[in-house]
From Swiss-Prot:
It comes from Renibacterium salmoninarum (strain ATCC 33209 / DSM 20767 / JCM 11484 / NBRC 15589 / NCIMB 2235). This is Aspartate carbamoyltransferase catalytic subunit. Catalyzes the condensation of carbamoyl phosphate and aspartate to form carbamoyl aspartate and inorganic phosphate, the committed step in the de novo pyrimidine nucleotide biosynthesis pathway. It catalyses: carbamoyl phosphate + L-aspartate = N-carbamoyl-L-aspartate + phosphate + H(+). Its EC number is 2.1.3.2. GO terms for molecular function: amino acid binding; aspartate carbamoyltransferase activity.
Length: 343
């Protein structure tokens, strides 16, 4: 597997391999000298056509901790702002012998186009394309969930998936590439996913996704959840009124102080609250929830570096598993590690 473009196409074996490799990379981030020589002499280009803070810095840190040379490219202030095409930009990077291109683009499908075009021979990693996908965010979210459950049950997370976990993804699903990537990856890893949103913020065809759909957050919490992932309301992508008011949205679909207390009342002591960031505090999540002991927001940021180190290393070393078409069972990981313990 040369590229990482979508979790839809990521088979179970490769996903587990990335998560397990990320565990090894996490030990590097805990050292005083956070550096490995694994990608020395390789060049990684961060090609960002959209604004980003967390993802760009995370990929830069990941590449540098593997000793790769990093080139940061931003569309603003570059020839792209003068009308240069993606093809011309890609061919320029090819002439500079880039080994990997991490691309974020406002157009859904741009990373796939770059990977399939033949314009560049580098590995391509999708860092978010339009409202389509954001695979490394989903991987770091799964990594965070897997680690949390392993800690609870006192077992190693290595080799395990998240089978049996109940995950609610709440909010602006329509505009969220994070939601799409998480639905596909978590389904592959065995989790039970429920999307919770107003009808106006659910995409057409969501009924075909491998998840349940609910319009009632309180009802979903009452049914029991192990992780609640709040999504940012993406006002910059909204050109119509998708809900009556921010107050109404927060009351019905925001994770406020009352819902934080509701988890305690329901006895859901180990339920975690997640958010991919950036957060709209007071809209989809209250400050009390974001800063609570249940929150994994900073863990997600921390884990993102380890997961992206793993992705870069496996893609550039050629070590990422290919699906075994002759024996599909080899792509299925044993999930009994803590599922038996949980029972």
């Amino acid at each position: 597997m040369k590229h990482l473009l979508s979790t839809h196409d990521l088979h179970r074996g490769a996903a587990i391999q990335i998560l397990d490799t990320a565990e090894e990379m996490a030990s590097v981030t805990e050292r005083e000298v956070k550096k490995l020589p694994a990608l020395r002499g390789r060049t990684v280009v961060n090609l960002f056509f959209e604004d980003s803070t967390r993802t760009r810095i995370s990929f830069e840190a990941a590449a540098k901790r593997l000793s790769a040379d990093v080139i940061n490219f931003a569309a603003k202030g570059s020839s792209v702002s003068k009308g240069e095409s993606l093809k011309d930009t890609a061919q320029t990077l090819e002439a500079m012998s880039a080994d990997a291109v991490v691309i974020r683009h406002g157009a859904s499908g741009a990373p796939q186009r770059l990977a399939d075009s033949g314009w560049i021979d580098a590995a391509v990693i999708n860092a978010g394309d339009g409202t389509h996908e954001h695979p490394t965010q989903a991987l770091l979210d799964a990594f965070t969930m897997r680690r949390h459950w392993a800690k609870i049950f006192g077992v190693s997370s290595v080799g395990s998936d998240v089978a049996g976990m109940r995950v609610a993804i709440v909010g602006d699903v329509l505009h969220s590439r994070v939601a799409r990537s998480n639905v596909w990856l978590l389904h592959t890893l065995g989790a039970q996913v429920t999307l919770v949103a107003p009808p106006t913020l659910l995409p057409i065809g969501v009924q075909t996704w491998p998840c349940a759909v609910s319009f009632d957050l309180d009802q979903t919490l009452d049914a029991g959840v192990d992780a609640v992932m709040m999504l940012r309301v993406q006002g910059e992508r909204m050109h119509a009124a998708f809900f009556p008011s921010e107050r109404e949205y927060s009351r019905r679909w925001g994770f406020d102080d009352a819902r934080l207390a509701r988890l305690d009342a329901l006895g859901l002591d180990e339920t975690i609250i997640m958010h991919p960031g950036p957060m709209n505090r007071g809209l989809e999540i209250s400050s009390a929830a974001a800063d609570s002991s249940r929150s994994t927001v900073l863990d997600q940021v921390r884990n993102g570096v380890s997961v992206r180190m793993a992705a870069l290393y496996l893609l550039l070393s050629g070590g990422l598993q290919q699906p075994d078409q002759s024996n599909p069972q080899r792509n299925v990981t044993n999930t009994s590690n803590w599922q038996e313990t949980k029972r």
